[in-house]
Amino acid sequence: MGALYCLAGLPGSGKTTFAESFLSEHPGMEYFSPDQYYEKINGDECDRRNTFEVWHAMFGDIHKAEVEGKDVLIDSDNITYAQRTQWLEWFPNFEAHHLMYFERPFELCLERVNSRRRTIPKEVMLAKLGAWDSPVDAPDRHRWDSVVCL
């Protein structure tokens, strides 16, 4: 059976940059990001319509990888305990579940997000910061095979 690697952190914290490097070191690993699915379904990752279809397609593909015993990397914000726990509950048949999280200064994240094609308003970023549940004290920490701050 494969392993599930889940990234967590604010937008702009370095998740996707890390993912690119991690994937190059782990050939054959499947990569899943909502941005990919917005691009595939809507034709543009900035077009945030069809949210249900995007997540439904992504979850279906992750399930297929789980059944096939593949390793997967999930690149999404996963800022709350509930968002992270869903991966454990929906995909329990992976051999291992690893959480890798990023805590960066808010202003750095905001600066990085504002340099992208798809920007996020400061108010939305502040709301995400306020919702951030640090994995250090999370009640589900013991359910992960490893929890690493990168």
Where are these regions (language model features)?
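A general structural motif
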Residues: 2, 28, 69, 94-96
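Short catalytic-loop micro-motif centered on adjacent basic/acidic residues
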Residues: 71-76, 99
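Conserved substrate/cofactor phosphate-moiety recognition/catalytic segment
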Residues: 17-70, 108-110
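ATP-dependent NMP and nucleoside kinases share a basic, alpha-helical "lid"
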Residues: 40-44, 66, 79-118
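Short strand-turn motif at the edge of the Rossmann-like AdoMet-binding core
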Residues: 36, 76-78
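Soluble or luminal CAZymes and related metallo-dependent hydrolases
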Residues: 50-57, 79, 83, 124
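Conserved GTP-binding G-domain of TRAFAC-class P-loop NTPases and closely related GTPase folds
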Residues: 2-8, 13-16, 21, 25, ...
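Conserved Rossmann-like nucleotide-binding pocket used by diverse enzymes
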Residues: 6, 32, 75
